[in-house]
Amino acid sequence: MASSGGELGSLFDHHVQRAVCDTRAKYREGRRPRAVKVYTINLESQYLLIQGVPAVGVMKELVERFALYGTIEQYNALDEYPAEDFTEVYLIKFMNLQSARAAKRKMDEQSFFGGLLHVCYAPEFETVEETRKKLQVRKAYVVKTTENKDHYVTKKKLVTEHKDTEDFRQDFHSEMSGFCKAALNTSAGNSNPYLPYSCELPLCYFSSKCMCSSRGPVDRASDSSKDGRNHHKTMGHYNHNGSLQKTQINSFKNSVACPGAQKAVTSSEAVDRFMPRTTQLQERKRRREDDRKLGTFLQTNPSGNEVMIGPLLPDISKVDMHDDSLNTTANLIRHKLKEVISSVPKPPEDKPEDVNTSHPLKQRRRI
């Protein structure tokens, strides 16, 4: 550092306030006009030099003002430092460097008791140990920031690859489901109303039957031959996707190939989709009647109020009050509650025709 006097306490070059930069672009200008000044770690310091403090005995107020930005270790006035008339120069040391940065940024060029403060770093007051510690802290911060940045870049790359894989799987699902739906649409007039033609959808049908083998026997000879033939067609259709897509298709073709077809051929939803409206209503009515008959058949309770399915739950254990009088009172209350619950009448189940006829017709207004 070059200095005008060459001794500690004289005016250093880095203490001089720079002029405001007039060549800065408009979009880069802030609310306050500033000079072009780059601070490296060797120029920053925990020591701050405050110039332009009015010489009216306001050291206490000055320290209280700077203490808002961090803990202050020491402060003193520099009487030998060259200053303007009727002003004083103070040196303040903060506990850490971050507090000194904030104090300099906030208090520089601020009005204080009628004077304009000029705050600058004073690294020349640091000892060798303080400088070594400052550099070590800065080095650790740089290492941590670099590691976080590398971790973020790696994570972003992994997320991008995972997103590409999910997009491919979603496209593959949609295309295969569309292929299965097209095969179901062309399978009108099949002898089995719950399944399409076996020659139209051998791959999906065979894979679904392999995954759900408990539903019934599978004709492995015919289905395997048809599956192989249609599998080559499907793989030929997706050859343009590249070697990566081929590997993914081979890895999960049994679990991903046609999940929509399994749901379509195993449930009656596919049948209802292509049935007329009247047939659907008749089917629903038949199901309701079957459920009603099944409920009547499962009524094992003589009272007919409950339907017993499966093992009975354990009864609620009675609480013992450890007193005959209290137990008698509790039993009376329980019996009374049972009588009240059993005596509540159930609302009559009226048919829709009866409900419609029970309401009186609205009379016309006489004019």
From Swiss-Prot:
InterPro entries registered for this protein in UniProt: RBD_domain_sf (IPR035979), RBM48 (IPR039599), RBM48_RRM (IPR034264)
GO molecular function, one term: RNA binding
Keyword RNA-binding: yes
Biased amino acid composition, Basic and acidic residues: 217-228, 347-356
The entry's keywords: mRNA processing, mRNA splicing, RNA-binding, Spliceosome
One GO term (biological process): RNA splicing
Positions of region (Disordered): 217-243, 277-303, 339-367
Coiled coil segments of this chain: none
Any one GO cellular component localisation term in the record: nucleoplasm
Sequence ranges assigned to domain RRM in this UniProt record: 46-124
Subunit field text: Component of the minor spliceosome. Within this complex, interacts with ARMC7 and PRPF8/PRP8.
Similarity annotation: Belongs to the RBM48 family.
Function description: As a component of the minor spliceosome, involved in the splicing of U12-type introns in pre-mRNAs.
Protein name: RNA-binding protein 48
